[in-house]
């Protein structure tokens, strides 16, 4: 009987508990928060998370509107409100002062500053109530219970279990751990289905080349952090690509988060939350998986500083999953609190007016163990020894670092700013950085300098004695000095007449005709012939005996002389892995010869149009190499260079089938402030752009057009024009490729090529890029920067319109 009396009391107690839980779960209209006081946050039912005002680290008077882990000592922030910056696409964190109010009223959530001005709202109306869920998701719901807005749909730098990122969303790293502004990295779920990680320029927001991608263009769907701790990218066919593979025994024993950290690494973290897990795990956030595994090696951008700031280098501690940026010897951070700004020398820059001896007395080259800056090259020498490599950098006021490779006897000089610096145990080359010489430091040049000083002292003493001994001797000495001065001036004039100007530093080597005649064995072995001359194989007659290719200009007419000078002035002052290297030249009497590095695999023309098709992977490698070479010519040289004669015959392949652009005889150099030029028709039938036949200025887009033709030839392993094909519609490749693309039959272009068929998505991407390059209107063609991004899959490719039916190169 007693238990029957107790039943109504139990029912009343349960009803009260239900009402109490409902009050905690639903945040009703009229509720508000202020930064200070007890009413500064709304707590989830389990108290694991809170939404509200969070004091900015190191600034007690400034507050974020945020979501954070409520039971952890440091109250780790996982979401923070942001607003657009001056109407631009980029955003800034919302930070307010004491006296601000966040209020849920009139069907909306609004944050106002102490003056009553609205500083943030989630842009939704008809809100009935809000909820702070135990998942860490803060939701605004309508009176019907439908979600109007949620923090999970507007992520900051972190995702949590059960959170899904759909197409078009992104994570932005913070600038610093305590600075919530958009940082230097993004993880984007692109609308084209590709999941991509980008370095991000600060403060412009410009995206550099990606350092990681899922390579799921047109296939990706969403990024998922599921309840079991797995993070994966779903594919439209239902399959999954694992992004992290961390496994924890019990999800209930840990808090979880995955954050795009300030160093660009996407880390999955766990934190023990109960007594069962704490004996085994430290009471702190522990990274259990990372992407990419080595950010220092993953980032290498042609534009931008790399993983760390300019003139610094990146190092990684694999055991702790941490990344650091360091300055080299005699350098210091520009801002110790913002190391991403890079390093600067702590010594005065070298005066370019110093003579060689003074420079060697003031500066030295210090070796750096296991550190490299792979880019920033502006000069290369081969063959050469390490002592000479050091000397050439010391006496050059532009040189900051010299790299010497003993195996190939090659020296590279690098100038400021140094980019993409990284520490790597596998650096095979000797890296030397220029530093000021201390007064007691030994020098590789010290003995030579001392001897020079000693010789100079005795020369002055001897000269003084001679001048004091006899008028006749004085007369003879003066005569000899005058004659020597005359010879020196005459010699300099001859050099100026015989040697084209080269403002990039030391010019290519000047060979005598007899040296090249001997090197080629009397010009016996022909490698190829062109309009301006014949190319012969040779071997330098020195201790290294490297193979060379010697181009002999056969007819010394005015146009041939002009092409010779252009070749030396363009390729002689450039260096890039995808440009053929000019080792030297001969300008003796009527003889004009150019000396290049030897390319063992010949021209792309021979490689591509042989009886057996080259592997698809090699063709992709060549296409990317040619694109990067043109990008360097168009956008990264001191002066823009338009090649004007891009074709397979002018693309050479080295031992590893790396593409090298060659033959710059028709090239045009443009000053920095000039983007177009007027010139006569240049190039080769089948590859020239339509504007050559019109009375309009010529721009770098003529090379883009030619590249489009070459790209189609690389995809299809056939020439642009083939008159002997069975199907007349296939005669002109550019027409046929466009027809196949429109009909969705790209496979016809690579019929019989199993490797290409297997990579049909990439084939389709390459064809689309080619069709964009072939647009008749130059302004519609992409730049080579955009071309490289499209080829790499870093940007979405819109459907190309039909190129004009007029193929001017065939006229």
Swiss-Prot record:
Any keyword ATP-binding?
yes
Q: Which residues lie on this side of the membrane: Extracellular?
A: 24-464
Q: What is its EC number?
A: 2.7.11.1
Catalysed reactions listed for this entry: L-seryl-[protein] + ATP = O-phospho-L-seryl-[protein] + ADP + H(+); L-threonyl-[protein] + ATP = O-phospho-L-threonyl-[protein] + ADP + H(+)
Q: Which cysteines are joined by disulfide bonds?
A: 296-314, 308-325, 327-343, 389-411, 393-399
| GO process annotations (BP) | defense response; response to other organism
Q: Where is the PAN domain?
A: 352-430
Q: How does it sit in the membrane?
A: Single-pass type I membrane protein
Q: What positions does the domain Bulb-type lectin occupy?
A: 24-153
Q: Which is one Pfam family of this protein?
A: Pkinase
Q: What does this protein do?
A: Involved in resistance against the herbivorous insect brown planthopper (N.lugens, BPH). Member of the BPH3 (BPH resistance locus 3) cluster which contains LECRK1, LECRK2 and LECRK3.
Protein name from the UniProt record: G-type lectin S-receptor-like serine/threonine-protein kinase LECRK3
| Originating species | Oryza sativa subsp. indica
What is the primary gene name for this protein?
Answer: LECRK3
């Amino acid at each position: 009987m007693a238990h029957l009396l107790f039943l109504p009391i139990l029912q009343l107690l349960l009803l009260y508990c239900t009402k109490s839980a409902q009050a905690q779960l639903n945040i009703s209209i009229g509720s508000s928060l202020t930064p200070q006081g007890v009413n500064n946050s709304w707590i989830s039912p389990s108290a694991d998370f809170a939404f509200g005002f969070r004091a900015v680290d190191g600034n007690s008077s400034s507050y974020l509107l945020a979501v954070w882990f409520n039971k952890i000592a440091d109250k780790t922030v996982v979401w923070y409100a942001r607003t657009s910056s001056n109407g631009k696409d980029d955003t800034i964190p919302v930070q307010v002062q004491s006296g601000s109010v966040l209020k849920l009223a009139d069907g909306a959530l609004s944050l106002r500053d102490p003056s009553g001005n609205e500083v943030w709202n989630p842009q939704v109306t008809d809100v009935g109530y809000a909820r702070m869920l135990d998942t860490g998701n803060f939701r605004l719901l309508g009176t019907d219970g439908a979600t109007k807005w949620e923090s999970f749909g507007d992520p900051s730098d972190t995702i949590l279990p059960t959170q899904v990122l759909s197409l078009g969303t992104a994570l932005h790293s913070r600038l610093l751990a305590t600075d919530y502004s958009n940082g230097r990295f993004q993880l984007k779920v692109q609308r084209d289905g590709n999941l991509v990680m980008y370095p991000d320029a600060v403060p412009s927001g410009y995206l550099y080349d990606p350092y990681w991608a899922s390579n799921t263009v047109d296939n990706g769907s969403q990024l998922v952090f599921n309840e079991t701790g797995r993070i994966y990218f779903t594919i439209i066919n239902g399959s999954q690509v694992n992004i992290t593979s961390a496994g924890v025994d019990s999800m209930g024993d840990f808090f979880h988060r995955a954050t795009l950290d300030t160093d660009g690494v996407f880390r999955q973290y766990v934190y023990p939350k109960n007594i069962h897990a704490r004996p085994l795990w430290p009471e702190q956030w522990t990274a259990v998986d990372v992407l990419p595994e080595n950010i220092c090696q993953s980032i290498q951008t042609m534009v931008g500083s790399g993983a760390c700031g300019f003139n610094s280098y990146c190092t990684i501690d694999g055991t702790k999953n941490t990344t650091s940026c360091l300055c080299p010897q005699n350098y210091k951070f520009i801002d110790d609190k913002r190391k991403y700004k890079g390093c600067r020398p702590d010594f005065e820059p070298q005066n370019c007016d110093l003579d060689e001896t003074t420079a060697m007395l003031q500066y030295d080259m210090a070796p750096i163990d296991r550190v490299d800056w792979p880019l920033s090259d502006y000069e290369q020498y081969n063959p050469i020894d390490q002592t000479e490599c050091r000397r050439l950098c010391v006496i050059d006021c532009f040189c900051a670092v010299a790299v010497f490779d003993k195996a190939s006897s090659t020296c590279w000089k690098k100038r400021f700013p140094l980019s993409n610096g990284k520490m790597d145990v596998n650096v095979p080359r000797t890296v030397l950085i220029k530093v000021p010489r201390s007064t007691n430091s030994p020098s590789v040049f010290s003995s030579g300098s001392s001897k020079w000083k000693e010789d100079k002292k005795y020369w002055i003493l001897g000269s003084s004695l001679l001048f004091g001994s006899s008028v006749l001797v004085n007369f003879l000495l003066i005569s000899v000095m005058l004659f020597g001065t005359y010879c020196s001036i005459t010699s300099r004039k001859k050099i100026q007449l015989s040697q084209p100007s080269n403002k990039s530093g030391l010019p290519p080597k000047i060979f005598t005709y007899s040296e090249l005649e001997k090197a080629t064995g009397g010009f016996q072995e022909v490698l190829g012939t062109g309009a301006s001359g014949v190319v012969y194989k040779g071997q330098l007659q020195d201790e290294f005996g490297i193979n060379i290719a010697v181009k002999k200009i056969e007819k010394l007419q005015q146009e041939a002389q002009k092409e010779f000078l252009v070749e030396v002035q363009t390729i002689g002052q450039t260096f890039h892995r995808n440009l053929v290297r000019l080792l030297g030249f001969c300008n003796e009497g009527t003889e004009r010869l150019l000396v290049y590095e030897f390319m063992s695999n010949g021209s792309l023309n021979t490689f591509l149009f042989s009886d057996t098709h080259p592997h698809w992977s090699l063709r992709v490698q060549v296409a990317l190499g040619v694109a990067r070479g043109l990008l360097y010519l168009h956008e990264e040289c001191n002066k823009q260079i338009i090649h004007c004669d891009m074709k397979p015959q002018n693309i050479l392949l080295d031992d590893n089938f790396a593409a090298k652009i060659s033959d710059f005889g028709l090239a045009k150099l443009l000053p920095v402030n000039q983007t177009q030029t007027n010139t006569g028709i240049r190039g080769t039938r089948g590859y020239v752009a339509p504007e050559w036949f019109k009375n309009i200025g010529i721009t770098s887009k003529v090379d883009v057009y030619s590249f489009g033709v070459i790209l189609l030839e690389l995809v299809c392993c056939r020439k642009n024009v083939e008159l002997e094909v069975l199907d007349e519609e296939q005669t002109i490749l550019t027409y046929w490729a466009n027809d196949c693309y429109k009909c969705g039959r790209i496979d016809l272009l690579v019929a019989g090529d199993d490797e290409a068929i297997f990579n049909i998505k990439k084939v389709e991407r390459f064809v689309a890029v080619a069709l964009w390059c072939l647009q008749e209107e130059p302004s519609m063609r992409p730049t080579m920067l955009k071309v490289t991004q499209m080829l790499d899959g870093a940007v979405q490719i819109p459907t190309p319109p039909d190129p004009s039916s007029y193929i001017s190169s065939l006229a």
